[in-house]
Amino acid sequence: MVEDLHTIVDVLSARSTSRDPAYIFLADGTAGSEVRWTYADTASNAADFAAWLSSRGVRAGSRVVLAVNPSLDYIAALFGVLMLGAVPVPCFPPLRPKELDRFHAIVLDCAPHAIVIDAMYDAQAEVLLRRLVCVDIHPLICFVEDLDTRADAVTPATCSPDDLALIQYTSGSTGSPKGVCVTHDNLMSNCEVLFRSMGPDPNRVGLSWLPPYHDMGLMGTIILSLHHGWPLVLMSPMHFMQQPRRWLEAITEYRVSITVGPNFSLDAAVEALDEDNEDLDLSTLREFYCGAEPIRADTLVRFELCTAPLGFDVTAMIPCYGMAEATLFVAGKRKGLHYNTVDAADGIVVSCGEVDSEHVVRIVDPDSNRRIPEGEIGEIWVRGRSVAAGYFNRDALTCKVFNARIDGEDDSYLRTGDLGFMRDGELFVTGRIKDLIIVSGRNIYPQDVEASVVRADPSLRRAVAFSVPGDGTERLIVVAEAVFTQISTDWHARLTDAVRSSVTSEFGVGPDVHICPRRTIPTTTSGKVRRQEAKRMFLAEAIQRTPA
């Protein structure tokens, strides 16, 4: 059906008379609160948003920040903006001060015509507008509750494949958020890539609790399900985080065949299980895409062992690799097979599967720009239709990141900043270049250290590792969060010793250990540890340190 269509708006228009289910939103995270939209409902509500925004002056090419809570309103606003040929800019609502600062940075960067937001954030919107006065940016604030369905209908804009579809801001784990310019062709191409990965399934049902502002939650579920034509069950990430078991209950209730989640969500799901799980059935799952953060073999094995009695098939687990700069998906394990692993010096590395035929992936020495032989670690470079047009208003950075060239070759590549290697046609990701720790001549990946820390004691839930200059060498620093808000001196000492012993035995390097209360370590909006920000805070003595 979609072979001759050029944009996701064309796809929605083609499905606009269908009464098949498109989106099922669980308002409180349970089936009892579901609200269903057919494709016809989705198209109609999107058209209402388009008409309303048009009456407020939004035109083709206008940038519109979408900071709406996860809901069907968000979906209607997203497709309504796209119908106008305008450019949606997904953004987390500014619930807390950290999110308000990020929100301000994004608005300052993209200078939108309008901001669509829930009325519950009116105070934050006022603060934002006051901040923007001095820089002459005056966005129109549009509260979703004020939607006027009486506005004159508009004809959907005609967009070309190369037109800008949306601006996806990166999570900013190693710096300030950057706006990735995703074209309509990028979106359609990545949907086709994922279709090849999944294959046809007339009975497919999806489920996502991921934030709809994140590339995996937006492109990998909301847009993808519309493109492929299967129903998608949605719940707020807040409801998942409050009770991760709701995810498993929804899989059971709706006989879900495809879902997605980062590594940490598998741990959360396992911890949500209890002795009585007879009400849970995961046998319908055929595809479980795991990505968005480093994938740990021990996490996968633990999840598989704990969910096997619930009917989970281990071949459904699909470790994958992607990023906003490539729209989303680059590589993933083939369906129906068990994922591969490789024993490395610092632990087991999980394969992210084969690279899709649409992409070309090369492993390159980041200093010499020369290709590296198979099996050796280097920077991952990507080329293909799904690679985005660049960063919004950052020409120099776009040239550096999106127009890299391998020594002796003419084609341009995307420099991902990720380290990895190829083996037997499969991609293995080992870490980030900026985060690599070099101590006493050894290369150490921080995520491996962080995993060792969390394994050291059940009271530790999150850790961050980085290096700082020492006397003639780099010092390995570990900051670990305990589950408690207050920690006694004796408990401090016990946890510190456990962490130091675990890290030293695994990596041969004795770390400086600092135990802190929960919610101390900075994270991105998608839950990734912000290592460079944590390092900056540590050096500025802004992180509470363990007493000497």
Which sequence ranges carry the predicted segments?
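Conserved AMP-binding/adenylation subdomain of ANL enzymes
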Residues: 188-205, 215-257, 272-275
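Conserved pre-ATP/AMP-binding loop-to-beta segment of ANL
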Residues: 19-21, 142, 150-169, 175-176, ...
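Structural core segment of the AMP-binding/adenylate-forming
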Residues: 83-151, 262-263, 268, 495
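AMP-dependent adenylate-forming
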Residues: 10-38, 165-167, 174, 322, ...
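Conserved AMP-binding/adenylate-forming core of the ANL superfamily
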Residues: 23-76, 95-104, 156-158, 179-185
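Gly/Ser/Thr-rich phosphate-binding loop
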Residues: 256-260, 272-346, 360, 369
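Conserved C-terminal "lid"/linker of ANL adenylate-forming enzymes
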Residues: 142, 464-466, 477-478, 500-548
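Conserved ATP-binding/catalytic segment of the ANL
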Residues: 359, 367-375, 379-439
